[in-house]
Amino acid sequence: MEDQKTTNQVNLIQLHSLKWVDDELAMIQDQYSATLSAINFPCYTQSSSKTKDYLVVVDGKVYGMVREINCGNRFEYRALMADGNYIEPVSDIFHASAIDAVCELARRHHDNEFANQLTDYVIAVSQVQELASAQLRKNTKYLLSEHF
């Protein structure tokens, strides 16, 4: 009976210690809400069964398109100019999120302030995800050490 009580307490501590993630992400969302609300994806076309092209409009100005490619267990995103030509990403790899591709389009349109705001948003979210992942690894290690 004592072992079960200890396990339940550990699980509560683990869940409680990750509550900060939701709070942090909500603060980031609030901080960047004006930037994010400027982006519209008013329509898309289905290019193939695994590809969708989304029109990107920022503050009423057409920036181009974002191509979403379904790779089975993940999606890749590419920025396209309005004429359909790809913009090669700076890193030479496809983007893991549509926001990164929109950032690429913003830079192409010399909207560096907007691109920098999007980059800051992506970095802030990534940092929270990394910290949460580290906390989960720590909790898992702790739970495993308690039982084995």
Segments predicted by a language model, with ranges:
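Short, mixed-charge low-complexity intrinsically disordered segments
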Residues: 115-147
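Generic short amphipathic/hydrophobic targeting helices enriched at N-termini
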Residues: 6-9, 17, 95-98, 118, ...
